[in-house]
Design a protein with these regions (language model features):
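Short glycine-/acidic-enriched loop or helix-start segments at secondary-structure transitions
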Residues: 15, 65-68, 90-93, 198-199, ...
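Catalytic core of DAGKc-family lipid kinases
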Residues: 3-6, 33, 72-185
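Gly/Ser/Thr-rich active-site loops/lids in small-molecule metabolic enzymes
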Residues: 144-154, 197, 203-224
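ATP/NTP phosphate-donor binding region
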Residues: 1-57, 64, 68-75
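Glycine-rich phosphate/pyrophosphate-binding beta-alpha loops
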Residues: 129, 133, 188-201
Length: 280
């Protein structure tokens, strides 16, 4: 049996083309389709055997949702990701962003990092963004709620950089070592290299290394930040050592003096002052 789990909110709530493709792909196995926002995902998958399979339609946020639903569960069925998101940073990190073949997820759903935010703990796939990048997600969520379909994340980032975002001060602690900053643009905790639809925030981070990478962009003024910002898509921003600290470790705590939006694999949490991310 093939279980097709789809996220109707993926790809800006337009997965009709991907759903048609996966139906054709799985037609011979008499597939069953279920909306993962309306079922007990863990129960559905745990009921399957090793000769069954799951085809998951969605992007990074959908994988994160699946990882949290299955956290601690034992299941036998292989789970494949069918590319149908907008950012697709997980696939980009694997070098499979343009692949038309489903990607086996099972090896990547183990030993995932956790993040604690506002009293809740989540598993995550790619990274935590806190600061400008979190606020971009908050703003674009509002645009989606208004029915805007075509959203340029880079353009929204630049708008906020130039006017809407006020840098907080804060502290970053990695494996017990704390550093204070007066002006923070972003402070991430990366498990993969990418977030934000192609931002190569942590170019040297290796998924599965047992470490996380904290990238702190600080101190720089608006003009300097604007000049260097495009380099985040190639990873060259880390060469701007005057204003970017890159620190690896197993436990990262970030504290801001002002409530700021945070994003977990593209999913927004508003009004955050602190988070802790760690990997076992």
């Amino acid at each position: 049996m093939t279980l097709i789990l789809f996220n109707p909110c993926a790809n800006n709530s337009d997965i009709s083309a991907a759903l048609a493709d996966v139906r054709a792909y799985a037609a011979a196995s008499d597939p069953v389709e279920k909306d993962l926002t309306r079922v007990d995902v863990c129960a559905e998958i745990c009921a399957l055997g090793e000769n069954d399979r799951v085809l998951l339609l969605g992007g990074d946020g959908t994988i994160m949702r699946l990882a949290n639903a299955l956290d601690g569960a034992e299941y036998a069925a292989p789970i494949y990701l069918w590319r149908s998101g907008t950012g697709n940073d997980f696939l980009r990190d694997l070098g499979k962003n343009e692949s038309t073949e489903p990607v086996l997820l099972n090896p990547y759903l183990v030993n995932l990092p956790r993040v604690e935010v506002k009293g809740k703990v989540y598993r995550y796939i790619n990274g935590i963004g806190f600061g400008l990048d979190g606020m971009v997600c908050e703003v674009t969520d509002a645009l989606k709620a208004k029915g805007v379909k075509k959203i340029n994340y880079t353009a929204e980032s630049i708008k906020l950089l130039l006017g809407g975002f006020k840098c907080p001060s804060g502290r970053v602690t990695v494996d017990g070592v704390t550093k204070s900053y007066k002006k923070i643009w972003l402070a991430s905790a990366m498990h993969g290299k990418y977030y934000g639809g192609g931002m190569r925030v942590a170019p040297d981070q290796e998924r599965g290394s047992g470490l996380l990478t904290c990238c702190v962009w600080h101190t720089s003024g608006k003009l300097a930040t604007l000049m260097h910002f495009p380099k985040i898509f190639t990873g060259e921003h880390v060469q701007y050592k005057k204003s970017i600290d890159v620190i690896s470790g197993k436990r990262i705590t970030v504290e801001f003096d002002t409530p700021t939006a945070l994003q977990i694999d593209g999913e927004t949490v508003s009004g955050v002052t602190t988070y802790t991310a760690w990997i076992d």
